[in-house]
């Protein structure tokens, strides 16, 4: 249930540095980091059930699905699934010419976005979107963004 992706862009995240330093437990090296990748499907595995096709533009992010059976999943807390597979940590990520990813990890890139624009949305974009979504702020409200690092900069977009 995997696809091979020709990587066109991969954003840099602080988690990639943590991966490089070996601070995530259980990482097997060598490992290519990169969990904010975008590119084109190069090959589709025989057992892929969703109708992904070669040539489709896709992106892969931090969260790539859940097992549905562990304690976290049974509580509905899918993001903390015991068996989650994270690109760049569980398997080689997007800091390579090609990567192999679970088909369940893919997001289709809209035509109006380039790979360079789409890749950072897969972690930094989701992180800042969820912060705003959960803040209670509404259209027209004034908000303060503290810090203008990578996430603060993305939030300003």
What are these regions (language model features)?
Residues 142, 154-157:
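Terminal helix/beta-alpha structural elements that buttress the NAD(P)+-binding lobe
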Residues 16, 132, 156-157:
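Generic hydrophobic/aromatic pocket-lining and core-packing "Φ" positions
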Residues 13, 40, 144:
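Conserved Rossmann-like nucleotide-binding pocket used by diverse enzymes
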Residues 66-146:
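NAD(P)H dinucleotide-binding glycine-rich loop of Rossmann-like/cofactor-binding domains
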Residues 10, 16, 61, 73-76, ...:
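Cys/His-rich metal-chelating microdomains
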Residues 15-21:
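Cytochrome P450 core scaffold surrounding the K-helix E-X-X-R motif
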Residues 1-10, 23-71, 105-116:
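Glycine-rich beta-strand-centered segment in the early N-terminal region that forms part
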